[in-house]
Amino acid sequence: MLLAGIIGAGLLAMRDRVTDSGRAQAGVTLPRHDVASPEGQEMLRIFAEGVGKMMAMPEGDPRGWVFQWHIHAVPDDRSKTAELVRLYPNSSDPGRILAEAVWDTCEAHFDPLRVNFFLPWHRMHLMSFERLVRSITGATYFTMPYWNYTDPDHRSLPPQFRSPDDPRWKPLFRTDRNPGVNDGLPIDQVGEAPLGLNAMMSPVYADTPDGDAGFCANLDNAPHSSVHVDVGTREKGMGAVSWAANDPIFWLHHSNIDRIWASWNRAGGRNPKDEGYLGQVFTFVDETGKPVQRKVADVLDTAPLGYAYDHYLDRPPGSVPFPGLSGLRFTNHTASHRFSGPVTLGSDPTTVQLKADGNSPYVARLHTASMAHRPFYLRIGGVRITRQPGVSYEVHLDPMPLTAPDRVSRSYVGTINVFGAIVHGTHTGSGPAPYTNPRNYSFVITDLVRNLLQAGRLTEPPSVMLVPTGTPRSGAAPTVDNISLVSS
């Protein structure tokens, strides 16, 4: 979907319409471009210049690379307290006071109850970083390009991020990427997670207790977390929350995530209206290195913020109309009866047998819901992880027996990516700790259910299989509290 008229004036005109402060003039909207486009390539050149200059700054400079990285999360090989003391020995140093306020503030990755702030927090961070690049480079017309990896033709890391010997692009190179990524292989072939737009199928922004986990949480899972674990290692790369923002591709990735949010809103998706959401304030750093506070209510529309996207995305076929949810529900117990309560995920596929609630005939209710064109969801609820397992988990509905299902199987529902698997311990300096609250995931499976019904399957309540994409790390034992099949 093309945003008409946004590019017509060209880059030269944009230069004339932006003030020296790095902020667009009132009423001026600048486009963020696909990095593969000519305009996006110009923006990438400016971005690389800015990254290089930021990396050359002292680590304690609020405008510098390390400080900006730590806003997202302090690396997990040190505590926040130790890092503050290292960079600011004087406890009254203004830089230390600012760092105390802004480091480790991406709460959505650390506390599942804060997941609804995932999108506005990153929008604020991205906007502040964008303005910082303008100030550092003098290119006041700069906008953050986006990496359009949802297009199958653009799933290789842009070549400029893979050029360690080129002086211009060297600041964009990192070694802590998965094998093959820096060789130009498509990341969905190298990694474990798909890169579709199924999150846009959700009709509501936030979690609903018995069905849809919501657009925000689903987008956080995929393609957001998918890209993180597909690109970088889970030790000190994009696949680890506390190291992710050290890879410059982080910024182009989140520009695309922001574009998906804006696209969902343009399609009719509504953001929360409660004051607890709208009134939340976060602190960042402005282009002068001073603190700046932003309220969620002020960043829900990109136009007043001075930017738009050159292209927006349509919702995928099979998306659930806005809004609605109620109805049919099935709950889980384990097929082997070895578990009472939570199901523990191990190194082998885990099968969970669903059973029907209520007294009316199971198949009749399924067919009634399907004939009424009601959407179906599969909800994976209460996921608790005390240690990063180093793998993702594919979800399959009613897999055929005696087969090893994979992502091309007819039973494939989606993938659970555990990018933010544990609470980041640097808030207290005590090291990682288990989640206090569990995460919820959901998948729209309307077409899958209808196809299974047409094939004569689902004559009995189906099973759900969770398949690790590799061998989990020793000691990792994720648990799932409940699984539900819901029709709205």
Task: Describe each PLM feature range.
Residues V18-S488:
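C-terminal accessory segments of proteins
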Residues M1-T19:
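N-terminal export signals
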